[in-house]
A protein has these predicted regions:
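Conserved terminal C-lobe alpha helix of the protein kinase catalytic domain
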Residues: 38-41, 45, 68, 72, ...
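Conserved beta-strand-loop-beta-strand hairpin that lines the nucleotide-binding pocket
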Residues: 1-32, 79-170
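Metal-dependent amide/peptide-bond hydrolase catalytic core
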Residues: 75
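Short, structured helix-loop boundary elements
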Residues: 37, 41, 60-64, 127
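Short beta-to-alpha transition helix within the HATPase_c
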Residues: 25-46
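Conserved short strand/loop->alpha-helix "switch" segment adjacent to the catalytic nucleotide/phosphoryl-transfer site
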Residues: 48-72
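Solvent-exposed, charged/polar functional surfaces in cytosolic regulatory/catalytic domains
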Residues: 43-50, 136
């Protein structure tokens, strides 16, 4: 019986594998991080690249970039409006091509849409942005008084393989 190879074929590039075969769930603890929104975007970027969803010319890149915008907004708001540990969870569901993002914090406050700050100081666009980009989002209360904001993003079906041209007989 031959031993497994240690060459490149033994560890194929995960971006070349079909999405339906990959599973990923990531939990990121953000309470000890200097720039939690940026850190969460980097963590999600690594996961999306591993899944092949952020390929330079891939069909999923645009939706994956929207996920990065959303997670940065969720984490930024959680850190701005609460004190205590903030957690980000992301999970890819390959069969349904759905990405679930959840950001938990100890604050009981629920995100709500407010008028954007027109003075140029920023703020007020987070919930509007999530409403526009997310397929679905809601708030789940925890028993300890905190909450998680959960966002679901549907990715488009993968492109169909081009039809095989008929072979000509000779």
């Amino acid at each position: 019986m031959p031993l497994p190879s240690r060459g490149p074929a033994a560890h194929p590039d995960p971006r070349n594998r079909p999405h339906r075969r990959l599973h990923a769930r990531t939990l990121t603890v953000l309470d000890q991080v200097v720039r939690p929104a940026a850190y969460s975007r980097r963590a999600l970027t690594r996961q999306l690249k591993h899944l092949g969803l952020l390929a330079d010319d891939g069909p999923d890149r645009h939706r994956a970039e929207e996920a990065l915008l959303i997670v940065g907004e969720l984490v930024g708001n959680a850190c701005r409006h609460s004190s205590g540990p903030t957690l980000m969870t992301s999970q890819w569901h390959p069969r349904t091509r759905r990405l679930t993002l959840a950001v938990s914090d100890p604050s009981p406050g629920v995100p709500r849409r407010k008028a954007p700050d027109e003075r140029g100081e920023g703020g007020g666009y987070g919930v509007l942005l999530i409403d526009i980009l997310a397929g679905h989002w809601n708030t789940v209360r925890h028993g300890d008084g905190g909450k998680a904001v959960v966002v679901t993003l549907d990715f488009p079906p993968p492109p169909a393989d081009p039809p095989t041209p008929p072979q000509q007989s000779r």
